[in-house]
Amino acid sequence: GRTSIDNLCRIVESAIKAGATTINIPDTVGYTIPSQFKTIIKNLFNKVPNINNAIISAHCHDDLGLAVGNAIASIEAGVRQIEGTISGIGERAGNTALEEVILTIKLKEELLNVFTNIKHNELYRTSQLISQLCNTPIPANKSIIGSNAFAHSSGIHQDGILKNRANYEIIDPKTIGVKAVQLNLTSRSGRAAVKHHMHEMGYQDDDYDLNQLYVNFLKLADKKGQVFDYDLEALAFISNQEDKDQEHFQLKYFSIHSGSTGVSTASVKLLCGNKILNEIITTRNGPINSIYQALNNIAGLPIVLEKFHLVGKGEGRDALGQVDIVVKYNNRKFHGIGLATDIIESSIKAMLNVLNNIWLSNKIKSKIKNIKNKK
């Protein structure tokens, strides 16, 4: 946008005469808008006599948030190669997000009159891998590959999705390798979403009172934000008096010894119901791994840690550390959160949160089984 079109045409023509087979047209500082970039490309095709002897490529930056828009506009003008990166990773505000261009082409193939041979079902997995390798977290609201891209929390949207997914999804999540759509339970969720989650857990309509469950759900959602499946179970089947039993595993003491040798020793003491249990574990995989092994040995549950995320809350030496974890148990996912100035303590709190949720879920399953056996 900052180079005169006549100069650009002369440069492109000379480069092709010199043997260039691909000519890249860059918007290096993300300065142009789609209509402007489209005009530039059209002028090249109209004014450069040997333009068809080379592939014209576009290289756009996202300084104004228009990289993908400019890339699509350039395709409409005749460009046949787009330079970009997964997630738009790049200099300053980033480059063209390839996954957005790829999916746009797939959905608008007839309109754009172009196609790609990309394996679309590898997009999500590839983006996750690149995020890990580059240590660049993917924003939850990122188009196509963000965790919220196929997540629905509005009651109207959730009801529409359950009736016909095409109502609020322009593409099947499986197309890019996402296994399932998410219906997040929040204070905006309706009865249909709550009922759907209960059915997904195997409960029938006559197992619980949906109206009462929904009233209790809204109260919890207002306090907690997002409600998980095991929260619903507790609301549906555990009375207020029994809520006191939820903290079955309580921390009484912990100690960590770790040094430059790479060996960590964790000692932990828990109150489990009315029993005090101790465990000491030594590992070579760090203090958190040691303490988690010790906790798991006490709980005796076949759990698998799938996600561990640590983020600082505040600044300075007295800042809080928040640990969020996701644990898999019996093909279900349980979430835990812990907050403390000591990251080991916050890690323990997060795991105890998970263990207590699992314990309560097992208690509910046992209770329901006994009721059905009596019938």
Curated annotation (Swiss-Prot):
GO CC terms in record: cytosol
Any one biological process term the GO annotation gives: L-leucine biosynthetic process
This protein's record includes keyword Metal-binding: yes
Domain Pyruvate carboxyltransferase: start-end pairs: 1-124
Enzyme class: transferase
InterPro entries: 2-IPM_HCS-like, 2-isopropylmalate_synth_dimer, AIPM/Hcit_synth_CS, Aldolase_TIM, LeuA/HCS_post-cat, LeuA_allosteric_dom_sf, PYR_CT
PANTHER family named among the record's database cross-references: 2-ISOPROPYLMALATE SYNTHASE 1, CHLOROPLASTIC-RELATED, HOMOCITRATE SYNTHASE-RELATED
Covalent S-S links between cysteines: none
EC number(s) on file: 2.3.3.13
Protein family according to the UniProt entry: Belongs to the alpha-IPM synthase/homocitrate synthase family. LeuA type 1 subfamily.
Keywords linked to the UniProt accession: Amino-acid biosynthesis, Branched-chain amino acid biosynthesis, Cytoplasm, Leucine biosynthesis, Manganese, Metal-binding, Plasmid, Transferase
Region of interest (Regulatory domain), ranges: 250-375
A GO molecular-function annotation: 2-isopropylmalate synthase activity
Organism: Buchnera aphidicola subsp. Thelaxes suberi
Pathway(s) the chain acts in: Amino-acid biosynthesis; L-leucine biosynthesis; L-leucine from 3-methyl-2-oxobutanoate: step 1/4
Function: Catalyzes the condensation of the acetyl group of acetyl-CoA with 3-methyl-2-oxobutanoate (2-ketoisovalerate) to form 3-carboxy-3-hydroxy-4-methylpentanoate (2-isopropylmalate).
Location of this chain's protein in the cell: Cytoplasm
Record Pfam families: HCS_D2, HMGL-like, LeuA_dimer
Subunit structure comment from the entry: Homodimer.
Name by which UniProt lists this protein: 2-isopropylmalate synthase
Binding positions for Mn(2+) per the UniProt entry: H59, H61, N95
Catalytic activity: 3-methyl-2-oxobutanoate + acetyl-CoA + H2O = (2S)-2-isopropylmalate + CoA + H(+)
